[in-house]
Amino acid sequence: MESDRFDYLFKFLIIGNAGTGKTCILRRYTERKFFPNTQHTIGAEFGSRVISVDGTHVKIQIWDTAGQERFRSMARSYYHDAVGTLLVYDITNRTSFGAVEQWLGDARHLATPGVVVILVGNKKDLRDTDGQVTHWEANTFAQENGLQFIETSALTGENIDDAFTSCVRVLLSKVKSGELGADRLLVGSNKQHLQAVNLTASATSVSASQSSAATAHSDTCLC
């Protein structure tokens, strides 16, 4: 569902090495399309979507951060007030899986305490031909670190919605139990309440269809 009315506003991050398909995941989720010529992100890309989970309307504001090491310090500035994180690796690239522990450390150190992190193995459509990271080893890492785990394909759309929805469901449970303060997350449909959420300053001024930074050209989805 798409609507201006929502009960909660959650800030999400998509993090992981460059080339894992983070921007493709963002655009598949927010625009319902796959863009094969997606470019490397410099700084961050932004998108949003309103969904209904168990009768509660939630607006997700999603920041897709640059994965290149030279932009790592810049990307860290986007962690403030994030409550949900998709930690993405490419199942056809073992190096990207080897980096998830460092990315996880950043999320847990810099984002909101208790941030919900889901480990996402992207490019599932290539597993049979080019897979380098098994489902078992990724799932083992997730269990050892208290993460949810899912494999996705931005190309086909498989499990993209489920990744975000499962995170939102856990967050709503945390709000209900008092583990996450609703005073920071409760927004409502009245525009005057938007100031109650402490997002990165530029977040409220960027539309869902805009990028917050320039990008460099590429021939494939190297986002």
From Swiss-Prot:
Superkingdom as given in the UniProt entry: Eukaryota
Record GO biological process: protein transport
Residues where lipid is bound covalently (S-geranylgeranyl cysteine): C221, C223
Alphabetized UniProt keyword annotations: Cell membrane, GTP-binding, Lipoprotein, Membrane, Methylation, Nucleotide-binding, Prenylation, Protein transport, Transport
Molecular-function GO terms, alphabetical: GTP binding; GTPase activity
SUPFAM superfamilies per UniProt: P-loop containing nucleoside triphosphate hydrolases (SSF52540)
Chain residues that bind GTP: 16-23, 64-68, 122-125
Function of the molecule: Protein transport. Probably involved in vesicular traffic.
PROSITE patterns: RAB
Family: Belongs to the small GTPase superfamily. Rab family.
Keyword Ribonucleoprotein: no
Name of the protein described by the UniProt record: Probable Ras-related protein Rab-4A
Modified residues (Cysteine methyl ester): C223
Cellular compartments annotated: Cell membrane
Motif Effector region, chain ranges: 38-46
